[in-house]
C-alpha cells in the first residue's frame, strides 16, 4: 500500500516536471508574458513593456 502511494506521487511529480519543461520550451520561442524576465533576446509581447528597472514584462 505504501509503495503504491509512493509510485503514484512520483508519477505525478514526473508528469508535472515534464509538462512544465514543455511549457517553458514553448514559451521560450514566443514573446514574454506578464511578469516574465525580458531582454533583447526575449522581448515582451505587444501588450506589455519591459520594465527598465526590474527587467520584466509589465503593463504600460
From Swiss-Prot:
Which SUPFAM superfamilies does the UniProt entry name for this protein? omega toxin-like (SSF57059)
Q: Report the GO molecular function annotations.
A: ion channel inhibitor activity; potassium channel regulator activity; sodium channel regulator activity; toxin activity
Q: Which GO terms describe its cellular component?
A: extracellular region
The keyword Plastid belongs to this UniProt entry's keyword annotation:
no
Q: In which broad location class does this protein mainly occur, judging by the first location in its UniProt entry?
A: secreted
Residues cleaved off as propeptide: 22-29
Q: Name one Pfam family in it.
A: Toxin_12
Q: Where in the cell is it found?
A: Secreted
Annotated domain remarks: The presence of a 'disulfide through disulfide knot' structurally defines this protein as a knottin.
Task performed by this protein: Inhibits sodium channels Nav1.7/SCN9A and potassium channels Kv11.1/KCNH2. Also binds the voltage-sensor domain of the potassium channel KvAP (from the archaeon Aeropyrum pernix) with very slow apparent binding kinetics and affects channel gating. Reaches its target by dynamically partitioning into anionic or zwitterionic headgroup lipid membranes. May bind to the open state of KvAP.
Tell me which family the UniProt entry assigns to this protein: Belongs to the neurotoxin 10 (Hwtx-1) family. 63 (VsTx1) subfamily.
Descriptive protein name:
U1-theraphotoxin-Agm3a
Amino acid at each position: 500500500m505504501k509503495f503504491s502511494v509512493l509510485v503514484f506521487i512520483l508519477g505525478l511529480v514526473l508528469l508535472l516536471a515534464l509538462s512544465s519543461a514543455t511549457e517553458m520550451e514553448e514559451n521560450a520561442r514566443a514573446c514574454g508574458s506578464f511578469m516574465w524576465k525580458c531582454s533583447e533576446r526575449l522581448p515582451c509581447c505587444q501588450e506589455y513593456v519591459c520594465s527598465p528597472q526590474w527587467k520584466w514584462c509589465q503593463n504600460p
